[in-house]
């Protein structure tokens, strides 16, 4: 389990390190102060992505059935995702605006599950209109993994944003805790100089994001993973 304090501390540290490596499209921490004086927040970023038109017709009929499945083999996902599928694409050419979409990613701490949860939305870069679920799904690497039956994963459901209140999509966190226990114990074998508690506290969020990120077009900087032995 991850505490809310650990989440905040790790998020702020991760944002600083990430933005020092890649600052074109930075992460930022949004602080929220509630009426009961409880302080909380979340971190957020955007990614610009070239529209994938190849799979639209093939995927549309199967989307509903695909999203009723769950995930089991996360390590296979990490090994099989092609980095080219998560390339950030930016364009200042107005003629290309219709071919670029914007993904908005928010990572928020869940008190119920005591784990980080990823929320996402997609928008047109041309007029900022929200994308349909089909348009979002067809442009996520996750859709290709599902189609090829390479693994099963915690699937995306439509929910209300827990802080902003707008409709968005959530990568369901029900198996996150079990997943992270396995990953952190495995990574602990390579970090004999750290006791279990310290390693858990320092690397939980980055380890989680290194698995979840490539599924949704978030490419983790190699130097960030290398410097933290992930």
Swiss-Prot record:
Entry EC number(s): 2.3.2.-
Any one GO MF annotation of this record: ubiquitin-like protein transferase activity
UniProt entry keywords in alphabetical sequence: Autophagy, Cytoplasm, Protein transport, Transferase, Transport, Ubl conjugation pathway
Any single biological process term in GO: nucleophagy
Main location class: cytoplasm
GO CC aspect terms: phagophore assembly site
Keyword Protein transport: yes
Highest taxon listed in the record's lineage: Eukaryota
Subcellular location(s) per record: Cytoplasm
Active site: 174
Keyword Heme attached: no
Enzyme class: transferase
Membership in a protein family: Belongs to the ATG10 family.
Purpose: E2-like enzyme involved in autophagy. Acts as an E2-like enzyme that catalyzes the conjugation of atg12 to atg5. atg12 conjugation to atg5 is required for autophagy. Likely serves as an atg5-recognition molecule.
Protein name (Swiss-Prot/TrEMBL): Ubiquitin-like-conjugating enzyme ATG10
Taxonomic source organism: Dictyostelium discoideum
Gene: atg10
């Amino acid at each position: 389990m991850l505490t809310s304090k650990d989440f905040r501390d790790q998020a702020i540290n991760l944002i600083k390190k990430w933005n020092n490596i890649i600052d074109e499209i930075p992460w930022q921490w949004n602080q929220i102060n509630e009426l009961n004086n409880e302080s909380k927040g979340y971190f957020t970023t955007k990614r610009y992505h070239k529209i994938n038109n190849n799979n639209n017709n093939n995927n549309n009929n199967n989307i509903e059935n695909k999203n009723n499945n769950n995930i089991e083999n996360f390590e296979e996902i990490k090994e099989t995702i092609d980095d080219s599928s998560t390339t950030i694409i930016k364009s200042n050419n107005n003629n290309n605006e219709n071919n670029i979409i914007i993904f908005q990613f928010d990572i928020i701490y869940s008190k119920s599950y005591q784990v980080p949860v990823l929320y996402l939305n997609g928008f047109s870069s041309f007029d900022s209109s929200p994308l349909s679920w089909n348009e979002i799904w067809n442009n996520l690497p996750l859709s290709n993994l599902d189609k090829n039956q390479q693994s099963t994963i915690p699937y995306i459901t439509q929910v209300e944003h827990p802080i902003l209140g707008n409709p968005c999509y959530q990568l369901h966190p029900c198996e996150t805790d079990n997943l992270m226990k396995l990953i952190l114990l495995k990574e602990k074998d390579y970090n004999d100089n750290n006791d279990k508690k310290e390693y858990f506290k320092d690397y939980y969020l980055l380890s989680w994001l290194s698995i979840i990120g490539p599924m949704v077009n978030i490419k983790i900087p190699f130097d960030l993973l290398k410097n933290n032995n992930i």
